Amino acid sequence: MNILRRGRLGSNVKEDVMKFTTSLEFDKEIFESDILCDIAHTTMLVEQNVISEENGKKIIAELKKIAEKGMETLDLDPSLDDIHMVIESELIKELGEDVAGRMHTGRSRNDEVATDLRLSLRKKVLEIITHLITMEKNMLAVSNEHKETLTVGYTHLQQAQPVTFGHQILSHISAIERDISRFFDTYNRINLSPLGCGAMATTGFNLNRKRTQELLGFYGLIENSMDGVSSRDFIVETMANISMLGTNLSKICEELVVFSSAEFNTIEIANEYTSTSSIMPQKKNPDVAEITRAKLSTLNGELVTVLTIMKALPNTYNRDLQEISPHLWKSVYTLIDSIQMVDGMISTVKVNKERMKENAEKNYSTATELADTLVRECGIAFRMAHGIVGELVKRSIEEKVEIKEIISEVLEKNNLSLSQEKIDTALDPFENVKLRNVIGGPAPEEVERAISSFNEKISAYKENLDEKIAEIESVKENLLK
């Protein structure tokens, strides 16, 4: 029986109501965090002389036993509502209510669950960052391998300008690097303690909130008690980061699907990330990229669901907040799985250099550089040069001739001239790439510089990550030793 019901409500409760309202199914995500929270709170109660040292030692010793045995060994009775009451009931069963019943002094499940969520989520955020750093390292290796691999870039999925495949990979690395930065920023706002806020108005007991903050490795306090129990903005912020990263990863999946098709044929996805057809024996389908793309799309829905649950809730705690958790954890695991899939596909992709080069050499991808050359060499306005090259492309298509065959005629008509050497250079796609050596450009030496810069950032991120992992591992070790 739920020990909370024996007073105000009585013991009668409908079974379907219990099953409908329990959170035990997804409380496994906060089990360890709840134990850590209980130990920290109990330690502080002893230090503040709120409970006796003898009772505190008994409670903490039993909590450590529960942690060691694991959640699966507990009586997960849905009538107990949640993992907090399951653990407290287990303590009472082993120690008696006069001892175990003192653990919850000065605390509510409201500040308890808010603390647990922050403890668990900070660990998951570091796990996400770990996978992202691994993926970025692997992508940087691919970029470095192909810093001189000529290909064509697209706008509107129409061939645009020559680039290198290494530069194309760097475009995704650049976006993901910002995602890593966002997760680190969010971590600092997750890692704040609401413990001690009580139900919503703190407590009359002489608690030391800064002590539990220290014991649990939080960077600071959520000071206002009403905000402390009601705020889930740290979850929304994390899920927004997840959704943004999911969008960035979905673009990679889309490129894997499109560019591996026979029509493009510039890359080939490794066999282990593909499947075949049940009827068409020739097929090699990019199933993993497609499924990953679809799963990443669900992240937006999870975020909107959480925002909708939170919208216009009365201030402080409402049980609606319980329904946020499953959407959070589903998003986290979907993202982690997806990162690993994208990492695997990019790391093992085969590049068709000849096809990439062929695409870069046709469909007028060098037209922009030809216009730029007219500006530099002939001193005309870019808009005029744009019009002249546009006319060249139009005639080339209509007359089915190469630009080289008609350029002298068109230039002469416009009282302009250009040496054959300048024309050849302007129309050479790799020369186009080499010329674009400004910061962020596709020139091989600039790609190499960018790779070095990203490697330095990744090293700094890894150092920061290792420090944070060590901090939370130290908390666990100190509380459970």
Curated annotation (Swiss-Prot):
CDD domains: Argininosuccinate_lyase. Pathway: Amino-acid biosynthesis; L-arginine biosynthesis; L-arginine from L-ornithine and carbamoyl phosphate: step 3/3. Its main location: cytoplasm. Gene3D superfamilies: Fumarase/aspartase (C-terminal domain), Fumarase/aspartase (Central domain), Fumarase/aspartase (N-terminal domain). GO terms for molecular function: argininosuccinate lyase activity. It comes from the Archaea. Its EC number is 4.3.2.1. It is an enzyme of class 4 (lyase). Keywords: Amino-acid biosynthesis, Arginine biosynthesis, Cytoplasm, Lyase. It is found in: Cytoplasm. The keyword S-adenosyl-L-methionine does not apply. One of its GO terms (biological process) is L-arginine biosynthetic process. One of its GO terms (cellular component) is cytosol. It catalyses: 2-(N(omega)-L-arginino)succinate = fumarate + L-arginine. Pfam families: ASL_C2 (PF14698), Lyase_1 (PF00206). Belongs to the lyase 1 family. Argininosuccinate lyase subfamily. This is Argininosuccinate lyase. The gene is argH.
